[in-house]
């Protein structure tokens, strides 16, 4: 998710972060020590965490049971925090969550098809 987020989206779209945008930064309440460099769209934090969460959901829900939802709640909290601290617009984290979810679902299905729970058989 991280590489595709950077090279397919960030370096193609080149959207400034809310805290870096000269027209918008006066409206941002930045809650971190500095505004990160780089571009904003998509949020790789959201993509990475939703990718992992959906991979775990697809691959391990039978093993982890209801605990698998903890990963999805964690991903949602990370995504919300990116907007809350002022380094992403809401659409950045929404797009990151969707992109990460698609990758997580795809890799989870591939994992189940080719490896599955054979790793637990001993």
Question: Residue spans of the language-model regions?
Answer:
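Transmembrane alpha-helix/helix-exit interface in multi-pass inner-membrane proteins
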Residues: 2-20
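Membrane-interface interhelical connector segments
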Residues: 14-33
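Membrane-embedded catalytic cores of phosphoryl/pyrophosphoryl-handling enzymes
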Residues: 29-122
């Amino acid at each position: 998710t991280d590489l595709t987020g950077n090279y397919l989206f960030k370096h193609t779209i080149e959207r400034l972060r809310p805290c870096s945008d000269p027209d918008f930064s006066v409206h941002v309440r930045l809650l971190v020590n500095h505004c990160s460099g780089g571009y904003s769209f998509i949020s790789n934090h959201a993509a990475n965490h939703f990718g992992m969460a959906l991979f775990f959901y697809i691959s391990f829900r039978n093993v982890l049971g209801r605990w698998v939802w903890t990963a999805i709640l964690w991903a949602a909290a990370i995504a919300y925090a990116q907007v809350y601290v002022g380094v992403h617009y809401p659409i950045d984290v929404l797009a990151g969550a969707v992109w990460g979810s698609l990758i997580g679902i795809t890799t989870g299905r591939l994992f189940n098809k080719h490896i599955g729970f054979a790793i637990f058989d001993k």
